[in-house]
Amino acid sequence: MAYERFGIILQSEQYDEDIGNTKVNQKMNEGNHYDLHRKNAFDRIIHSESKKGDNVINYNIHENDKIKAADNIFSSKLKMNPNMSYEMNINCFKNIGYGENQETSKVLTNSLSNNDINTEESGVVDKNSPFLTLGTTILNSNGKSRRWEQKLVHIKTMEGEFSVTMWASGISDDEYSGSDQIVGASDLLKGKEEFGIDGFTSQQNKEYQKMESKFTNAQTLEMPHPISSVQIMDHLIKERGNLSQENNISERILSKTTLSFEEPILLPDSSSIELVNETAAMTINNHRTLSNHTGNTGDLHALPSSVPFRIGLHEGQVNDCLSTISQSTHQDNTDSTGCGEMNLSEVTVSYTNDKKIACPHKGCNKHFRDSSAMRKHLHTHGPRVHVCAECGKAFVESSKLKRHQLVHTGEKPFQCTFEGCGKRFSLDFNLRTHVRIHTGDRPFVCPFDACNKKFAQSTNLKSHILTHAKAKRNTSISGKSGCSNAESNSQSEDTSANYVKVELQDSVTENHVPFVVYAD
């Protein structure tokens, strides 16, 4: 009985028994079956070609060995699980020397085709042959010819891509439609093949998609909400508004602060004293006698800083009559007469809540707001136990002695970092002063009108102010002495040279050294 299995017409008497035996765990070893029938087929071909001569037989034997070496072994196991689903396990794919033996296969095909023609003409066909191979033309159940060809098929799986050589029939669909087939076996085999490759691939794709979706969900990051630039600008504007409010409050406090004078201060009419420093600035525009005892009023304008200050007047070799200054609270301006020398170096201008705690050390007239500041200052009057071995200078603190010793050792640990300079200094103060040469910073400004000169060091500013005083002395009118009334006093004030000392309190400077400016 002829039947078709795996796309090949076979004839076997045991086919009925094979159809009846449909067990769930049926195992088919196709590889061994394939090799056995292929060997028998080639033996038949070689036997049929023996009549053409020994050369053809030897050639076929030689080509047979090459084809066996280059054969692609495709073995698969078809399993039927309890759920009646089939799985196809590809054991191995071997493709050895397919390109090298392609020409050999063509030569063998031509020789076999000639054999087919001779066989058809003689009418001798061995129906007991279980397998007919490459290039063999046979008759199916309807007597139509069929040609088997070898094709290269690409199979893609989850693990990789493989190339498999499979056998295919060269018959057309029209010729094949009229043939009688065993539907049960062909459909069963077709279903197994489709499920084995396509079904397995689709199932693996679905599982892969599920795993990918789970991985994607697991890797999803929760990003915070973006911060708007408008919110940032609002926050900055709000902070800036708070700072401006604080500045306005401080300015209002300074503008409303009234100054009380303990003793009268006489300023010349042309005096315009202005202190410009890194931390404080003060301008006094008053052309009258300032006294809170004589009924005269005094004004201080443009006070932009809350730094405490002191104003003292030093009279240098001037014998003027200052009848307008009275030491008594009930004396009148016209009652005071006479001439004399007066020392106004201790006259101060202070706030109402000025420092009240005085330094107890003899000869020190400094005052402080609290006792802790006074005790800190009192330490400077302590015993100078740290003495320099080189020059004999004594210091209260050891840090001051170490700084002084740098002068003798010549060590200069402070170096200028500007490119191309590299100068070194023994004191950090000198380095800061030197850096102003590179930066161009000049914080010390001349306080006189029409003179806007700036200096990097305070000593240079002091020397410059003395030039203004000398110039005024040279151009002033001298020779006026003696006074009897307020008019003579005002004239003597215009011609006199009074030096004004403006100094900041201890809390201003870093080393508690007052900053002093002398002005005419």
UniProtKB/Swiss-Prot annotation:
Statement: the UniProt record of this protein carries the keyword rRNA processing: no
ZnF bounds (C2H2-type): 357-381, 386-408, 414-438, 444-468
GO cellular component: chromatin; Ino80 complex; nucleus; PcG protein complex; polytene chromosome; polytene chromosome puff; transcription regulator complex
Single Gene Ontology BP annotation: DNA repair
SUPFAM superfamilies xrefs: beta-beta-alpha zinc fingers
Xref: InterPro entries: Znf_C2H2_sf, Znf_C2H2_type
Keywords of the record: Developmental protein, DNA damage, DNA recombination, DNA repair, DNA-binding, Metal-binding, Nucleus, Repeat, Repressor, Transcription, Transcription regulation, Zinc, Zinc-finger
Record bears the keyword Repeat: yes
Disordered: annotated span: 475-497
Pfam families: zf-C2H2
GO molecular function: chromatin binding; chromatin DNA binding; DNA binding; DNA-binding transcription factor activity, RNA polymerase II-specific; RNA polymerase II cis-regulatory region sequence-specific DNA binding; sequence-specific DNA binding; zinc ion binding
Localisation: Nucleus
Main location: nucleus
Gene3D superfamilies, alphabetized: Classic Zinc Finger (3.30.160.60)
Role, per record: Polycomb group (PcG) protein that binds to the 5'-CNGCCATNNNNG-3' sequence found in the regulatory regions of many genes. PcG proteins act by forming multiprotein complexes, which are required to maintain the transcriptionally repressive state of homeotic genes throughout development. PcG proteins are not required to initiate repression, but to maintain it during later stages of development. They probably act via the methylation of histones, rendering chromatin heritably changed in its expressibility. Probably targets the Esc/E(z) complex to DNA.
Subunit structure: Component of the Esc/E(z) complex, composed of Esc, E(z), Su(z)12, HDAC1/Rpd3 and Caf1-55. This complex is distinct from the PRC1 complex, which contains many other PcG proteins like Pc, Ph, Psc, Su(z)2. The two complexes however cooperate and interact together during the first 3 hours of development to establish PcG silencing. Component of the chromatin remodeling Ino80 complex. Interacts with Sfmbt to form a pho-repressive complex (PhoRC).
PANTHER family: TRANSCRIPTIONAL REPRESSOR PROTEIN YY, YY2 TRANSCRIPTION FACTOR
Protein name in UniProt: Polycomb protein PHO
